[in-house]
């Protein structure tokens, strides 16, 4: 095993399985078909990491946005109870279309509960270890963007999820390892104990800081170096469409910066070891970065074992 084959194996680990991706797409299409024929619905938009092709294993939810016609709901979009009203309406329609007696496909949705922005819909048995939800978010189209409800503040906030979808697609078209590399740094974030890092934070950082056209190890090392410098400087990580402000206001920036700096240092040492033809040491150091899910170096750590890299497809998974 060498560094290249170790990264290929790790890519397979962080990628969601083909079966889970197919299941997620089917659920997304189910909601699209169910709401696409509704008289008060303008369109249904795929959203979230599945739509961007950056979801990692396991898939926790599938995001879909139901854009309602403003003329059918003139009271929506204003501060006050209309945010809760929109969520209640969406929940009622999900149950009517896909619940036990659903008119579109009965029994697909077992139960629902709305959260701050969306209605969370459970389709799996409660004891299914691979269960994941569909999160249906109501929205209105306004001034070229979307307005979505925020129940806690009783307000509607502006957003543009299609901006990020297009931006990620552009990066991946330039460098076909971009989406896979995003999954890797999101997997890194999920392993950090004591600090909650939203996956979207890592994705937005990668959009700005992940270099394109380099080998994957070098690109990820440079990403960690740049990300550590940015977070250490106290610069906010904002919505890339410049509409929603900070992505994670409660993020512990100091601890996040420490973790990024540690990853940058280990990644830099790994690249140096690889340059010095010590593949085993490099693999061990990348394991220090990513954790136990990264492949271990060969048992004969003092010798060089250079295997021909396998071909791994990194197809867009959205």
Model regions and ranges:
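A generic, well-ordered mixed alpha/beta core segment in the N-terminal half of proteins
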Residues: 78-99
């Amino acid at each position: 095993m060498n560094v290249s084959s170790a990264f290929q194996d790790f890519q397979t680990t962080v990628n969601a399985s083909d079966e889970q991706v197919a299941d997620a797409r089917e659920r997304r299409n189910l909601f699209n078909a169910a709401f696409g024929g509704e008289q008060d619905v303008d369109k249904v938009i795929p959203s979230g990491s599945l739509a961007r092709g950056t979801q990692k294993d396991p898939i926790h939810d599938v995001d879909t946005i139901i854009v309602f016609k403003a003329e059918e709901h003139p009271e929506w979009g204003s501060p006050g109870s209309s945010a809760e009203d929109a969520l209640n309406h969406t929940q009622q329609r999900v149950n009517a279309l896909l619940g036990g007696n659903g008119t579109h496909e009965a029994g697909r949705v077992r139960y629902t509960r709305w959260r701050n922005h969306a209605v969370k819909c459970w389709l799996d048995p409660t004891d299914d270890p691979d269960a994941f939800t569909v999160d249906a978010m109501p929205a209105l189209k306004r001034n070229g963007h979307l307005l979505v409800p925020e129940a806690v503040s009783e307000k509607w906030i502006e957003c543009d999820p299609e901006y990020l979808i297009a931006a990620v697609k552009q990066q991946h078209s330039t460098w076909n390892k971009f989406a896979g590399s995003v999954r890797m740094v999101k997997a890194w974030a999920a392993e950090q104990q004591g600090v909650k890092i939203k996956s979207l934070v890592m994705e937005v950082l990668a959009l700005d800081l992940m270099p394109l056209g380099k080998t994957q190890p070098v690109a990820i090392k440079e990403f960690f170096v740049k990300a550590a410098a940015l977070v250490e400087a106290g610069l906010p990580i904002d919505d890339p469409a410049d509409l929603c402000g900070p992505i994670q206001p409660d993020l512990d920036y100091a601890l996040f910066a420490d973790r990024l700096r540690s990853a940058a240092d280990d990644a830099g040492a790994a690249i140096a070891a690889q340059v010095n033809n010590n593949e085993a040491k490099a693999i061990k150091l990348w394991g220090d970065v990513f954790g136990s899910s990264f492949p271990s170096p060969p048992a004969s750590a003092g010798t060089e074992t250079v295997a021909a890299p396998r071909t791994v497809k990194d197809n867009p998974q959205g």
